[in-house]
């Protein structure tokens, strides 16, 4: 018996998406971003499936170490860098590249005695104003890294977009120009484009692209779909109907009796709720896919269940699949109904949801 709820992960879709991104950025290497448990798709699942990626981007040291312990030998890049001497020593020991974005990290490098030089990506704050050295700091920081014997040469260079998922926002072009002006004539590898940069700003693709959400078949742009770019959804979130009930006009359903039927109908109870990571704030009308059609959520999402209006003539049965998002019902569409982004939906599934790679 298959577990439910479950997130079915398509290796075919993952491989398609990597190949498609290579077509979109033919002159760039691909740093596949697999942080946050592979965007909810399973860290090792994704890394082994995409073992032909040129490297993997992680947020935290434990994620990178999990890949090394899982047999992944590819290039790994720690996007938030290290925050202790122990972390730095461990990264070097396991051949993990590190981003350097603040003075504390720089001083740790300068004061360390390492078994071999660390491979560094110097992060420039070109407009995101979250991590990185400012343009005014850049030259001095670069010179200190150049002079540091604990840093492998050449130094690699990186920045991150603030608004690339808004294709008409002029600030992205400003960031591209600022980054290119600062690093002009310097050696080392360059990386600027995230998923949105890769898809919408080809001039940002540089030596390495860093796709995250696009690898999983999802568009980073609200109102867009991954399928519009030849991407395939890699996750299908599936549960089952555990009850089908006749429901009379005027009767409520669920906590708070927030929804009343306007006419006689049949309701289906789906075995998934906020305890599984499905958002409690999903409003009435959010679609679920049952037997080839969209049916709306009615009433409140509870911890283990939600209810859908199947319609008076429904022939659905207990045990039938209910798809919360996937090929037929894009996660981007569900996110828009809920008032969130697809990133949040796929990364917030709890351990109660079985993640199954085909």
UniProtKB/Swiss-Prot annotation:
Catalyzes the interconversion of L-alanine and D-alanine. May also act on other amino acids. It catalyses: L-alanine = D-alanine. PANTHER family: ALANINE RACEMASE, ALANINE RACEMASE, BIOSYNTHETIC. The keyword Isomerase applies. Belongs to the alanine racemase family. GO terms for molecular function: alanine racemase activity; pyridoxal phosphate binding. Its cofactor is pyridoxal 5'-phosphate. Substrate binds at residues 130, 303. Its EC number is 5.1.1.1. InterPro entries: Ala_racemase (IPR000821), Ala_racemase/Decarboxylase_C (IPR009006), Ala_racemase_C (IPR011079), Ala_racemase_N (IPR001608), Ala_racemase_pyridoxalP-BS (IPR020622), PLP-binding_barrel (IPR029066). NCBIfam families: alr. PROSITE patterns: ALANINE_RACEMASE (PS00395). The active site is at 35 (proton acceptor), 255 (proton acceptor). The modification N6-(pyridoxal phosphate)lysine is found at residue 35. Keywords: Isomerase, Pyridoxal phosphate. It comes from Shewanella sediminis (strain HAW-EB3). One of its GO terms (cellular component) is cytosol. Pathway: Amino-acid biosynthesis; D-alanine biosynthesis; D-alanine from L-alanine: step 1/1. This is Alanine racemase.
